[in-house]
Amino acid sequence: HNSIGTLTIRDNDRNYLIVESPAARIDFRRADGLITRYEADGMRLLDAGAVVEPNFWRAPTDNDFGAKLNEKNRAWADPGLTLVSLDHTLSDGVAVVTARYDFQRVTGRLEIEYRIDNAGEILIRQTLHAAADKGEPDLLRFGMRMRMPARYDRIDYYGRGPWENYADRKDGALVGRYRQTVDEQFYPYIRPQETGTKSDVRRWRQHDIAGRGVEITASEPFSASALHYAQEALDEGLTKQQGHSQEIEPDDAVWLSTVWGASTPGDSFRSGNTACHMEIMNSNSK
């Protein structure tokens, strides 16, 4: 046990590193360093069996297929993230957990630092050191995602809207505050592909009907989406399967994705590091 004030790190569990206070509990799985339990202010913010995980991929679009990015960069869909170390410290009322990774299928290193306070609020800094070699695949996006229980089906965000928008097609989407539902996010393209993302976001709130949930902000404007579909369900793989969007069954959950760097459809990119802040919202949040 390490403790300071009411914040405690339990490192004597065989399978989990546990950060807890009277108001919150966050479990890190020792096998991969990922958050597998996130509870705060009486809320269970992760769906059963879900994790908070880094994400380097999105469902390919028609333009991506045309540029063959679905083939060239496919390694980043599952880069073989391998935990190298999981360290923790506790000082000044903040628990700091640092996970470091290598990749099996691409050349690079990843570090994720989590700074957790008594309320269960998390400051996440994710840093990617990717190889700059010409032959290495590029990322389609750089961010994180988590699967939340279906009750968190409301969105309140400040960014571009009200419809989906991306770096290369956003001029017609004005910056403002928008309140929407997850059901409204999925655009039924004829063929399944990336959909529903909002860009230039300053603040994203994912909450239930009572206004309880999480608020995400970042060190600079970011993109985000919340769907009833995992990106894997919208990804047809190496070749077009001529599937139809209406044939895909929605999940009884909410897939929340935050994106700190992203390619435009038909293009790709490389990125460095960023920080995002995940804050707990109670029913009094405005």
What are these regions (language model features)?
Residues 2-286:
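Beta-strand/loop-rich accessory regions of lumenal/periplasmic or secreted enzymes
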